[in-house]
């Protein structure tokens, strides 16, 4: 298919917005991820595994709805900054407000941490997203960068918790859980760190990259952080309820034989 014709079709559906191509692809990839997780989880009987599937399926499901809304221009507003009109997709922040706590919940379930720790993580995470949105909707550069800094500090706090408290808790659950947790945490550390960098160089910040490239990069980050995360998690034995069961020792076998 001619890519120019494909882009023209997306432009028509998206009221001439060039970024609609990437929003459409993002919608499709999120839907594929949701469907894959649903099919993979169908018939799973392990209680713990079903809990992980329930949480993880919601992540790309919510994201696909957000991307579809942005594709059709819903969740889009204009903000004037320094006399220049900027297109701001606040639907993206709505997506993150729901999906990032779910990703953290998956990690918290792996580590088996208490409710207070989970509540703290989710609360700081929500503050990170809300302050980022306030920054995106602010009309002065100083306000935008101040809120960006506030949001980034919140992100650092969340990542610190993951790399310290939760990592230690996951390590106590055995090598299978620790390995999966470390892999997922490394993925989160890399990808989540890229978000504020893209924000600051994108149209919401310094404007080094245009809205089309910015949308493409956010789409790649979102798909990897949601579908990629879920793919790694749900293929691991760490989600099964018997991961903590100790193997019988040789001495126990002898005693049983007696």
UniProtKB/Swiss-Prot annotation:
GO MF entries: monoatomic ion channel activity; photoreceptor activity
Topology versus the membrane: Multi-pass membrane protein
Primary subcellular site in the record, as a coarse category: membrane
Function noted in UniProt: Light-driven proton pump.
Extracellular-side positions: 7-18, 72-89, 138-141, 203-210
Protein name per Swiss-Prot or TrEMBL: Archaerhodopsin-3
Keywords (A to Z) from UniProt: Cell membrane, Chromophore, Hydrogen ion transport, Ion transport, Membrane, Photoreceptor protein, Pyrrolidone carboxylic acid, Receptor, Retinal protein, Sensory transduction, Transmembrane, Transmembrane helix, Transport
């Amino acid at each position: 298919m001619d890519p120019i014709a494909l882009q023209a079709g997306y432009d028509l559906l998206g009221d001439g917005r060039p970024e609609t191509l990437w929003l459409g692809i993002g919608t499709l990839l999120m839907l594929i991820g949701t469907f894959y997780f649903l099919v993979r989880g169908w018939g799973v009987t392990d209680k713990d595994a079903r809990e992980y599937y329930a949480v993880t399926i919601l992540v790309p499901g919510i994201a696909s709805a957000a991307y579809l809304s942005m594709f059709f221009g819903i969740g889009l507003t204009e903000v004037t900054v320094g006399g220049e009109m900027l297109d701001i997709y606040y639907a993206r922040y709505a997506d993150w407000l729901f999906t990032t706590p779910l990703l953290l919940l998956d990690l918290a379930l792996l580590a088996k941490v208490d409710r207070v720790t989970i509540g703290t993580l989710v609360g700081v995470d929500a503050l990170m997203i809300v302050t980022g949105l306030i920054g995106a909707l602010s009309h002065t550069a100083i306000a935008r960068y101040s809120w960006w800094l506030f949001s980034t500090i919140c992100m650092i706090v969340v990542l610190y918790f993951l790399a310290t408290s939760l990592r230690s808790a996951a390590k106590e659950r055995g090598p299978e859980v620790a390995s999966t947790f470390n892999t997922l945490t490394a993925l989160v550390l890399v990808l989540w760190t890229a978000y504020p960098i893209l924000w600051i160089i994108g149209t919401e910040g310094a404007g080094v990259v245009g809205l089309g490239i910015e949308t493409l990069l956010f789409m790649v980050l979102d798909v990897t952080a949601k579908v990629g995360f879920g793919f790694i998690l749900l293929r691991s034995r760490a989600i099964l309820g018997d991961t903590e069961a100790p193997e019988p020792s040789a001495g126990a076998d002898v005693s049983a034989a007696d």
